Swiss-Prot record:
BP GO annotations: photosynthesis
Membrane topology classification: Multi-pass membrane protein
Protein name, entry field: Photosystem I P700 chlorophyll a apoprotein A2
Cellular component, GO, one term: photosystem I
Species per Swiss-Prot/TrEMBL record: Cyanidium caldarium (Red alga)
C-alpha cells in the first residue's frame, strides 16, 4: 500500500529519488496507468470530475459578474458605451506611486482599475442586463450552480450513485440526450431569453423577476403560433434609425430574417439571432429523436457504420469495427471532441469580428483584437491535443484484428502516401511563399519596389463577389444587380446583407490584395507543416521501418540507444512536442495578419498594410517594431503611463519564453552534473546543511525537460503577444 505521494502508484511511491515527485505529477491524470484502476471506475472518475470542471467555470464566471458589479462601472458604461472604458476590477497594489494611481484611475472612477478587454460588458448589455443588481443576481445564481455541481460530483463518487459501465457506453441514448437536451433545449432556452428579456430591453423595456410574467414579448401573444400565422412574428421589425436600448423607432417583431447589422450598434439584429437559435433548437430536438433506444424505432449506430462499405468492394470494409473501437477508446472520443472544439473556437474567433453579435463591440478595437487572438490560440492548443490523443489511441487502444481492412487499418497501410503528400504540399508552399517574399525584400532593399512580384487573389475576390461584394467588378451572382439571386435577396431573404457586405464600417468581407495573398499562403504553409508533423506522429505511433515495435515503448520514450540506428525524437510525444512549435508559429502568423490589417483599417490607413505586407522587412519594421514602441515606452526615466503594466508583462513574458531554451537546448547530463555540484555545496554549507531531504535529487528525463522547455516557450510566447496586441491597440485607440 502506497503511503507517500503518489498514492496511485506503488512503484513510484517507493522510488528513493526525486523522480517520485516529478513522475507522480506527470502521471496524476493518466488514470489508465494507476494501480487497481478498472475500466468502470476509470469512467466513473472522469464523469465525476466533469462536475468539478463545471463548478470551476461557474465560480470563475460568477467572479467576473461580482467584481464588475462591485468595482466596475457597468451602469455608467451603459449610458455611453462608445466613450466610457469598461472596468474589469479595482487594483490594490502597494507598489503604486502617485503617478500610477493617477494613470490607472480610468473609466470615470477615482481609484486604479483594470480595463475589461473581454467583451463581457457588451454581452451583458446585449442580453438585457441594465443594473449592477442584475450582475449581483447573476453572480449569486452561478455560485449556487457551482455548489450544486460540486455536490453532484461528490454524489456520483458514492457507490449508490456511480453509473455503470453500460450506461457510459449507451451511445444512442447519450447522443439523443445530448442532441435534444444539451444543444436543442439549451438553444430553445436561449431563444426564449432573447425574446422575453433581451429584445424588450433593446427597445427600452427592462425585464426583471418583478415584471417577467406580466410583460408579453409580442402584442399578439401565442395566437400566431397556434393559428399557424408564424410570419406575424416577423412583421414590423426595428427601424434602421432605432436607438438601441430605447423605444425610439423600435418595432414589434421578435423573429426576423433581416441580415446585416443594426446601423447604430453595428451588431447583428437581436431578432435575427433569436430566429437563428429557434431554428437550431428545432433541428437538434428532431435530431435527438433519431437513434434507437426504448421503442425499437430509429437508427442503430452500429448498423449505420457496418453498412458504410465502398460499393465496389475494392476499398476495404469501410466503417466495420469502428463502433466497438470508438466505444471502447476514451482517447479516440477525446480526440474527436478536441478536434470539434478546436474548429468551433477558431470559428468563434472568425465570427466575433466579422459578424459581431454584441452591441457596440465592433467599436471596441482592443476587445476585438484580444478576443480574436484568444480564441485562435485556444483553437491551436485544442487541435494539437486532438492529434496527441489520436496518437495515444493508436498506441494503447487500437486493435489490428478488430479493425482488419477498415478505414483505420487502410489509413495505416498507406501512411507513406499520406505523409509524403503532406510533405510535398508543405515544401511547395514553403519554397514558393518564401521565394516570393524574399524576392520582394531584395528588390525593395535595392530601391526597385516596382519590381516586386504582386499577385492579386482573383479566386478569393471572385468568391467574395459571388457573396455580393461589388468592389472588384466581377458581375456574378450577388455582385450582379440583374441576377435572380440578387432579386431574391431583396424580397425573400436577408434584405440588409448586400448593404452590409459593401459597407466599410464593418469587417464582414475585407478588401484583399497581394499582401493578403502572400500571408494566406504563409498561414497555409504553417497549417500543412503542423498537420504533417502531427499526422506523421500518429500514423507512426505504433511502429515504423526504423522501429517496428515502437508501440511497446508507449506514447513517450526518450531514446532507444544507438543500436537501433538512433531512435531519439521518434516517439508520438516528440511529434506533439514539435507540432506545438509549428502550431504557435502558424497562430502567430494568423494573429499578426489579422491585427495589422485591422489596426490600419481602424486608423483609416489601409494602404500601410497593402504596401508593406508584401515583403518580410515590412512585417518586421512596420508591424512588429513600429507597434512595439508604446510598450517599450510604457515606463522610462521620465515616468510611466497606463500601458506600463503591459510593458512590464511584455518584458517578463520574453524572459519566460527565453528560459524555455535553457531546458530545450541542454539535456539530462548537464543537469545531473549541476545537481550533483549543488548537492555537494549544500551539504558543506553551514546552516543550509541543517536542511536535508529523503529523496535523492536526480535530473529530469529528456522528455520531462523538453516538456518544461515547451511550457516555458509556449506560455512566454503567448503572453508576449498578448501584451503586445493589447498595448499596441490600446495605445492607439484608448
Amino acid at each position: 500500500m502506497a503511503t507517500k505521494f503518489p498514492k496511485f502508484s506503488q512503484s513510484l511511491s517507493s522510488d528513493p529519488t526525486t523522480r517520485r515527485i516529478w513522475y507522480g505529477i506527470a502521471t496524476s491524470h493518466d488514470f489508465e496507468a494507476h494501480d487497481n484502476v478498472t475500466e468502470e471506475n476509470l469512467y466513473q472518475k472522469i464523469f465525476a470530475s466533469h462536475f468539478g470542471h463545471l463548478a470551476i467555470i461557474f465560480l470563475w464566471t460568477s467572479g467576473n459578474l461580482f467584481h464588475v458589479a462591485w468595482q466596475g462601472n457597468f451602469e455608467a458604461w451603459i449610458a455611453n458605451p462608445l466613450k466610457v472604458k469598461p472596468v474589469a476590477h479595482a487594483i490594490w497594489d502597494p507598489h503604486f506611486g502617485q503617478a500610477a494611481l493617477k494613470a490607472f484611475s480610468r473609466g470615470g472612477v477615482n481609484y486604479p482599475v483594470d480595463i475589461s478587454y473581454s467583451g463581457v460588458y457588451h454581452w451583458w448589455y446585449t442580453i438585457g442586463m441594465r443594473t449592477s443588481s442584475d450582475l449581483y443576481a447573476g453572480a449569486l445564481f452561478l455560485l449556487v450552480l457551482a455548489a450544486l455541481c460540486m455536490f453532484a460530483g461528490r454524489l456520483h463518487l458514492q457507490p449508490k450513485f456511480k453509473p455503470s459501465i453500460s450506461w457510459f457506453k449507451n451511445n444512442e441514448s447519450r447522443l439523443n440526450h445530448h442532441l435534444s437536451g444539451l444543444f436543442g433545449l439549451s438553444s430553445l432556452a436561449w431563444c426564449g431569453h432573447l425574446i422575453h428579456v433581451a429584445i424588450p430591453a433593446s427597445r427600452g423595456q427592462h425585464i426583471g423577476w418583478n415584471n417577467f410574467l406580466t410583460t408579453p414579448p409580442h402584442p399578439a401573444g401565442l395566437k400566431p403560433f397556434f393559428t399557424g400565422n408564424w410570419s406575424d412574428y416577423s412583421l414590423n421589425p426595428d427601424d434602421p434609425s432605432h436607438i438601441f436600448g430605447t423605444s425610439s423607432n423600435s418595432g414589434k417583431a421578435i423573429l426576423t430574417f433581416l441580415g446585416g447589422f443594426h446601423p447604430q450598434t453595428q451588431s447583428l439584429w437581436l431578432t435575427d439571432i433569436a430566429h437563428h437559435h429557434l431554428a437550431i433548437a428545432v433541428i437538434f430536438i428532431i435530431a435527438g429523436h433519431m437513434y434507437r433506444t426504448n421503442f425499437g424505432i430509429g437508427h442503430n449506430i452500429k448498423d449505420i457504420l457496418e453498412a458504410h462499405k465502398p460499393p465496389s468492394g475494392k476499398m476495404g470494409l469501410g466503417h466495420k469495427g469502428l463502433f466497438n473501437t470508438i466505444s471502447n477508446s476514451l482517447h479516440f472520443q477525446l480526440g474527436l471532441a478536441l478536434a470539434c472544439l478546436g474548429v468551433l473556437s477558431s470559428l468563434t474567433a472568425q465570427h466575433l469580428y466579422s459578424i459581431p453579435p454584441y452591441a457596440f463591440i465592433s467599436r471596441d478595437f482592443v476587445t476585438q483584437a484580444a478576443l480574436y487572438t484568444h480564441h485562435q490560440y485556444i483553437a491551436g492548443f485544442l487541435m494539437v491535443g486532438a492529434f496527441a490523443h489520436g496518437a495515444i489511441f493508436f498506441v494503447r487502444d487500437y486493435d489490428p484484428k478488430q479493425n482488419k481492412d477498415n478505414v483505420l487499418y487502410r489509413m495505416l497501410e498507406h501512411k507513406e502516401a499520406i505523409i509524403s503528400h503532406l510533405s510535398w504540399v508543405s515544401l511547395f508552399l514553403g519554397f514558393h511563399t518564401l521565394g516570393l517574399y524574399v524576392h520582394n525584400d531584395v528588390v525593395v532593399a535595392f530601391g526597385n519596389p516596382e519590381k516586386q512580384i504582386l499577385i492579386e487573389p482573383i479566386f478569393a475576390q471572385w468568391i467574395q463577389a459571388t457573396s455580393g461584394k461589388t468592389l472588384y467588378g466581377f458581375n456574378v451572382l450577388l455582385a450582379s444587380s440583374s441576377s435572380s439571386a440578387t432579386q431574391a435577396a431583396q424580397s425573400l431573404w436577408l434584405p440588409n446583407w448586400l448593404e452590409a457586405i459593401n459597407n466599410n464600417n464593418n469587417s464582414l468581407f475585407l478588401t484583399i490584395g497581394p499582401g493578403d495573398f502572400l500571408v494566406h499562403h504563409a498561414i497555409a504553409l504553417g497549417l500543412h507543416t503542423t498537420t504533417l508533423i502531427l499526422v506523421k506522429g500518429a500514423l507512426d505511433a505504433r511502429g515504423s521501418k526504423l522501429m517496428p515495435d515502437k508501440k511497446d515503448f508507449g506514447y513517450s520514450f526518450p531514446c532507444d540507444g544507438p543500436g537501433r540506428g538512433g531512435t531519439c525524437d521518434i516517439s508520438a510525444w516528440d511529434a506533439f512536442y514539435l507540432g506545438v512549435f509549428w502550431m504557435l508559429n502558424t497562430i502567430g502568423w494568423t494573429t499578426f495578419y489579422w491585427h495589422w490589417k485591422h489596426i490600419t483599417i481602424w486608423q483609416g490607413n489601409a494602404s500601410q498594410f497593402n504596401e508593406s505586407s508584401t515583403y518580410l522587412m515590412g512585417w518586421f519594421r512596420d508591424y512588429l517594431w513600429l507597434n512595439s514602441s508604446p510598450i517599450i515606452n510604457g515606463y522610462n526615466p521620465y515616468g510611466m503611463n497606463n500601458l506600463s503594466v503591459w510593458a512590464w508583462m511584455f518584458l517578463f513574458a520574453h524572459l519566460v519564453w527565453a528560459t524555455g531554451f535553457m531546458f530545450l537546448i541542454s539535456w539530462r547530463g548537464y543537469w545531473q552534473e549541476l545537481i550533483e555540484s549543488l548537492v555537494w555545496a549544500h551539504e558543506r554549507t553551514p546552516l543550509a546543511n541543517l536542511i536535508t531531504w529523503k529523496d535523492k535529487p536526480v535530473a529530469l528525463s529528456i522528455v520531462q525537460a523538453r516538456l518544461v522547455g515547451l511550457v516555458h516557450f509556449s506560455v512566454g510566447y503567448v503572453l508576449t503577444y498578448a501584451a503586445f496586441v493589447i498595448a499596441s491597440t490600446a495605445g492607439k485607440f484608448n
